[in-house]
Amino acid sequence: MGRTNTSDQLNAISDKNTKRKSLALDNEYHNNSSSEDDSSKIELSYTIPDNNNIISQETTTSVEDVLSLSSAPQNELRLRKQKSNNQDSPVDLNGVIVDVSKREKIFLKRKRQIDNKHGSDKSKYLSRFNDITFKAKSSTIFESDEFYKTDFFGMYVLFWLATAFAMVNNLIHTYFENSTPILQWTVVKVFKRDLFKVGLVDLAMYLSTYFAFFVQYACKNGYLSWKKVGWWLQAAFDGLFLFFWLWIASEYCLDFPWIAKVFLVLHSLVFIMKMHSYAFYNGYLWSIYKEGLYSEKYLDKLTNGKVTLPKGHTKNETEKVLQESIAFTKYELEYQSHATTENPDDHHVFDIDQTDKSIAKLQQEGLIKFPQNITLFNYFEYSMFPTLVYTLNFPRTKRIRWSYVFGKTFGIFGLIFLMILIAENNLYPIVLRCEIARKLPVSERIPQYFFLLMDMIPPFLMVYLFTFFLIWDAILNAIAELSKFADRDFYGPWWSCTDFSEFANQWNRCVHKFLLRHVYHSSISAFDVNKQSAAIITFLLSSLVHELVMYVIFGTLRGYLLLFQMSQIPLIIMSRSKFMKDKKVLGNIICWFGFISGPSIICTLYLVF
């Protein structure tokens, strides 16, 4: 290994040791927020140069091969950066010095807080990916014993009984007053059209997601480097994946009906999030794993006198840097291997004695499960789990409750039938009226719009609620039961939320967890923004994706949904004001007003204007 590469390796390790210290004191991701001084955020995933010859390097290194050493302000070893033509070097020491000077006050301020919370053991670290914990919970809110024991359980029963009576009434009138057979309904014909082709396209789309696995498999076998090539390939494939399958479903290719288009675009977004989480989670672990191997090898050479240090610098200083690097990498790999047990410890008490064992030994003992997790079966399992966030250890159930699966399957088809019934008898006639109104002059169209809106709200609200139960309660739980996935945290009590940020967290927990880890926290780390800016970035990305779905449905780009979603930001700010602080009922009323009217307003806007 050349002198420049050796210098870059040691420089990167020293750089990351300093950054991790700041991270541990100032960036607790598990609290779902950034620290008080958001300008000090740093990313843990700074990687060392990827060199497959690190382990097989020559047994001796000249004086020039080793970087000059100097002491840092906190008695930490700091390595001076040398000029290098190696473009893979991740180190910018000038930036590190600036970062450390900014964080010194924060370091001292938070040290007591962290020591009180975690103890004074210096081996305590905070993992980058400790923001999400999977828990073994095989029941949802509506299935829990706590829910059945509440005084409001009868209201849930009343909702479904009232729904049943309304649907039976609708069905009776349809049967006796409408001579058209059910299979000839307009909505049913749209639903059935190209059904077999849609299934084949969806299967092909699923199989293409295995690209993410093969990239990681290539990294595992040394065919390519994640840092140099892998992440570029994955990022490019993610973008290509979305637009390719959108094109396949569009009128320019297979010309699927709008229901099929919506299904495929939503499923493609699910696959993209799953691939992204799998790829970049493992990509982060590659940087940690390779750093640990390098530090072990270099420390062994230093201990055995096979590396000559420059004059004026002690062996102890270099050993301290390497030992700290080894301690953290072993901690991180072990944490990620065991952090999602049934009773997880967010900070994963790390046995300092484990640093005496090599990474290979810890792998043999099962304490480190990376990169052994990169197998075809592991990816297949993950692809079947109803989650968008990858980790090394998911909670599992011991058996499949087939009666539970049957109940959820019956609910899936029942809810689909009810949604078709409402769409055919209530929504479709309004859509036809909207098409007529669309041809009117604007002066006549606006009054008609309000009549259409009022007629649209009741049936659209029912479809809105049925969609929630269909996807998050029926489909996801059925998939979870079949795959023995124990964490059923698919939704929270969104119906009781008092602001729209709480609704965003509770309505779709799967997407929320993905955005929290891979958008919100990554924005703080990568772009050095505060938590408010990161929240806006996350909100904007979510809004753009929703607007894309609207474009697929209506074939026009209007931006109505984007505008309405972004308008939630001032509402969130208002909900957190002193005026709204103790007004939970008013906050819930505002939210429910949005739930009831918002979807109908947006739908009719796209149809009429």
UniProtKB/Swiss-Prot annotation:
<keyword id="KW-0808">Transferase</keyword>
<feature type="transmembrane region" description="Helical">
    <location>
        <begin position="253"/>
        <end position="273"/>
    </location>
</feature>
<dbReference type="GO" id="GO:0005789">
    <property type="term" value="C:endoplasmic reticulum membrane"/>
</dbReference>
<comment type="similarity">
    <text>Belongs to the membrane-bound acyltransferase family. Sterol o-acyltransferase subfamily.</text>
</comment>
<feature type="transmembrane region" description="Helical">
    <location>
        <begin position="451"/>
        <end position="471"/>
    </location>
</feature>
<feature type="compositionally biased region" description="Polar residues">
    <location>
        <begin position="1"/>
        <end position="15"/>
    </location>
</feature>
<comment type="function">
    <text>Sterol O-acyltransferase that catalyzes the formation of stery esters.</text>
</comment>
<keyword id="KW-1133">Transmembrane helix</keyword>
<feature type="short sequence motif" description="FYXDWWN motif">
    <location>
        <begin position="490"/>
        <end position="496"/>
    </location>
</feature>
<feature type="active site">
    <location>
        <position position="546"/>
    </location>
</feature>
<keyword id="KW-0812">Transmembrane</keyword>
<feature type="transmembrane region" description="Helical">
    <location>
        <begin position="402"/>
        <end position="422"/>
    </location>
</feature>
<dbReference type="GO" id="GO:0004772">
    <property type="term" value="F:sterol O-acyltransferase activity"/>
</dbReference>
<dbReference type="Pfam" id="PF03062">
    <property type="entry name" value="MBOAT"/>
</dbReference>
<protein>
    <recommendedName>
        <fullName>Sterol O-acyltransferase 2</fullName>
        <ecNumber>2.3.1.-</ecNumber>
    </recommendedName>
</protein>
<keyword id="KW-0012">Acyltransferase</keyword>
<dbReference type="InterPro" id="IPR014371">
    <property type="entry name" value="Oat_ACAT_DAG_ARE"/>
</dbReference>
<feature type="transmembrane region" description="Helical">
    <location>
        <begin position="152"/>
        <end position="172"/>
    </location>
</feature>
<dbReference type="InterPro" id="IPR004299">
    <property type="entry name" value="MBOAT_fam"/>
</dbReference>
<keyword id="KW-0256">Endoplasmic reticulum</keyword>
<feature type="transmembrane region" description="Helical">
    <location>
        <begin position="534"/>
        <end position="554"/>
    </location>
</feature>
<dbReference type="GO" id="GO:0034737">
    <property type="term" value="F:ergosterol O-acyltransferase activity"/>
</dbReference>
<keyword id="KW-0472">Membrane</keyword>
<dbReference type="GO" id="GO:0008203">
    <property type="term" value="P:cholesterol metabolic process"/>
</dbReference>
<dbReference type="GO" id="GO:0008204">
    <property type="term" value="P:ergosterol metabolic process"/>
</dbReference>
<feature type="transmembrane region" description="Helical">
    <location>
        <begin position="229"/>
        <end position="249"/>
    </location>
</feature>
<feature type="transmembrane region" description="Helical">
    <location>
        <begin position="589"/>
        <end position="609"/>
    </location>
</feature>
<feature type="region of interest" description="Disordered">
    <location>
        <begin position="1"/>
        <end position="41"/>
    </location>
</feature>
<feature type="transmembrane region" description="Helical">
    <location>
        <begin position="195"/>
        <end position="215"/>
    </location>
</feature>
